[in-house]
From Swiss-Prot:
Cofactor details (free text): Binds 1 Mg(2+) ion per subunit.
Cofactor: Mg(2+)
Name of the protein in its database record: Bifunctional protein GlmU
N-acetyltransferase: region residues: 249-455
Disulphide bridges: none
The encoding gene: glmU
Upper lineage: Bacteria, Bacillati, Bacillota, Clostridia, Peptostreptococcales
Taxonomy, superkingdom: Bacteria
Catalytic reaction(s) noted: alpha-D-glucosamine 1-phosphate + acetyl-CoA = N-acetyl-alpha-D-glucosamine 1-phosphate + CoA + H(+); N-acetyl-alpha-D-glucosamine 1-phosphate + UTP + H(+) = UDP-N-acetyl-alpha-D-glucosamine + diphosphate
Record family assignment: In the N-terminal section; belongs to the N-acetylglucosamine-1-phosphate uridyltransferase family.
Length: 455
């Protein structure tokens, strides 16, 4: 039987106090809405439909082409939102999800759908018990323990407010019965809204079975309505991600102080120190050490690499290379194996071959550096003429002395040497020493003549 997910994402989220639609706020690098869609696709769902409203165009742009959308022009309640998706409701199973609930898991969705189908229910609600249920809809059961109704707190009596079983906002419906029930929905409540929760009572009054599937933990159904709740949800997501990596053989020295996005891959026996930030489609190999306060974004790191307190963005680092401390690899830096990029070295849009090193205080921009090359302290690859960027090539086994400038476009041929303090404007031939600096002149007695002698 076909399973569709209708995801409610039309709300303004006024308590977020943000220009950004609520469902587009990110949790561990991915929007809340896309977290929900990912989970739906990872379960048994074959098709996702998102109900958009506030910030509709921005929300649509965040979605992949296979996700369909319907517009709720007026926000008249969750039931009204479901009405807008009526053209997509058929005789299969309809799973209704909340776009601001990113912690729901595939396992829970699969179990809920299985419970719904095996019990031959026409509607099922996912619930849990909560010690402090303030603000949430209460599950009212009859004497036999069956669902009688779901009542929103603003419409609840004092007796109903004392109930601790709460509504998750996640439902399963038989599509054919849901289509029959939707036209019967009324807005006779304190908010003058069409409550989705009333549909369950309607289906029950139609003579069909309504199921209640209770979760043991509240965590999965937490919704985000404020910045504080966003932080709470992200903390849980971070903990989940860290646990997954630790279960796969990664050592995380202080999981509460490491930020890893869901899309990151980390190899076994890698160690992460506090303050590490790993984002995007970063892949880190095995046996690496990622030192404190390192930030790595959309980068591929080989095996046995050590990164100390450095930033690496959109780059690639080969096996057994050492980066940092305080190095900065900007986009399109391709670093080979057994390379050393030391403290306060910046690399941008450059290729650096195996066994080469730039140990400290250098700028390597728009360069092609070969194997076994030494870049001395204070070397600058001068790549910009005020209008255009130009490339510099330093071939294998070359040596660039400290405090030298390589004015692009220029090439240092294989085994070429550049003397310290030189400004190179012409190609250096293979096996040659280039010296491009003024000759030293010593003026004897100058200090005494100027009255500067301290003795």
């Amino acid at each position: 039987m076909k399973l569709k997910a209708i995801i409610l994402a039309a709300g303004a989220g006024t308590r977020m106090k943000s220009k950004l639609p609520k469902v587009l706020h990110k949790v561990c690098g991915r929007t809340m809405l896309n977290h929900v869609i990912d989970v739906a696709k990872g379960s048994m769902v074959q098709e996702c439909i998102v109900v958009v409203g506030h910030g509709a165009e921005d929300v649509k742009e965040s979605l992949t082409p296979d996700v369909k959308t319907v517009l709720q022009k007026e926000q008249l309640g969750t039931g009204h939102a479901l009405m807008m998706a009526e053209p997509y409701i058929d005789d299969g199973t309809i799973l209704v999800l909340c776009g601001d609930g990113p912690l729901i898991t595939e396992e829970t969705l699969n179990r809920t759908v299985a419970y719904h189908r095996e019990g031959n229910f026409k509607a099922t609600v996912l619930t849990t018990d909560l010690a402090n249920p303030k603000g949430l809809g209460r599950i009212v059961r009859n004497a036999e323990g069956q669902l009688e109704k779901i009542v929103e707190e603003k419409d609840a009596t004092e007796e109903e407010k004392a109930i601790i079983e709460v509504n998750s906002g996640i439902y399963c419906f038989d599509g054919e019965i849901l289509k029959e029930a939707l036209p019967k929905l009324k807005n006779e409540n304190a908010q003058k809204e069409y409550y989705l929760t009333d549909i369950l009572s309607i289906i029950r009054n139609m003579g069909f079975g309504v199921g209640v599937y209770k979760l043991e933990e509240y965590e999965e159904i937490m919704a985000v309505n404020s910045r504080e709740q966003l932080a709470d949800v992200e903390a849980i997501m971070r903990r989940r991600i860290a646990k997954k990596h630790m279960a796969n053989g990664v050592t995380i020295m202080n999981p509460e102080h490491v930020y890893i996005e869901k899309t990151v891959t980390i190899g076994a026996d890698t160690i992460l120190y506090p303050g590490v930030i790993l984002t995007g489609n970063t892949v880190i190999g095995e046996d690496c050490i990622i030192g404190q306060n390192s930030r790595i974004e959309d980068t591929i790191i080989g095996d046995g690499v050590e990164v100390q307190s450095s930033t690496i963005i959109h780059s690639k680092v080969g096996n057994f290379t050492h980066i940092g401390p305080y190095a900065y690899l900007r986009p399109n830096s391709n670093i080979g194996e057994h390379v050393k990029i030391g403290d306060f070295v910046e690399v941008k849009n450059s290729n650096i071959g195996d066994h080469s090193k730039a140990s400290h205080l250098a700028y390597i921009g728009d360069a092609d550096v070969g194997q076994n090359v030494n870049i001395g302290c204070g070397v600058v690859f001068v790549n910009y003429d005020g209008k255009n960027k130009h490339r510099t090539t330093v071939e294998d086994n070359s040596f660039v002395g400290s405090n030298s400038n390589l004015i692009a476009p220029v090439t240092v041929k294989e085994s070429g040497y550049v003397a310290c303090g030189s400004t190179i404007t012409k190609d250096v031939p293979e096996g040659s020493l280039a010296v491009a600096r003024a000759r030293q002149e010593n003026k004897e007695g100058w200090t005494k003549r100027k009255g500067l002698l301290k003795k």
